[in-house]
Regions:
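Extended polybasic, low-complexity segments that bind anionic RNA or targeting/receptor surfaces
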Residues: 1-114
Length: 114
């Protein structure tokens, strides 16, 4: 794999944690996160709402933005969230977490968006 270009120590630590995991999905996520900031995806809530199923765990290797509404109960993990998206996620009784927290929980069925 390429060397990490990020100078953010939190992201560097997350990439190292993901690389140590045995599952292929975590290694894929490490590659996506190690991209430059402008090449990481930004995903709107409307897109997540359209493609996700209730009860699902979604990971965004970038930022979650607030455009649209969320009417399903899902768990969203991302590197960052806009303040408005956090409010909308809370109002829909869904849950949002940093990717590092989700990795520690070791979820079984996850989907990567973006």
């Amino acid at each position: 794999m390429k060397k990490t270009k990020s100078i953010n120590p939190e992201i560097r630590e997350l990439i190292e944690i993901l690389k140590e995991r045995d599952e292929k999905i975590w290694k894929d996520l490490a590659v996506r996160i190690s991209k430059s900031k402008r090449n990481r995806p930004t995903v709107n809530l409307s897109s997540i709402n359209r493609h996700a199923k209730s009860g699902e765990i979604i990971i965004v290797p970038g930022k979650v933005l607030s455009y649209g509404k969320l009417d399903k109960k899902i768990t969203i993990g991302a590197l960052s969230f806009s303040e408005e998206s956090k409010k909308k996620i809370k109002n829909s009784k869904s849950d949002f977490k940093k990717i590092k927290e989700l990795v520690k929980e070791k979820p079984n069925k996850i989907r990567i968006f973006g």
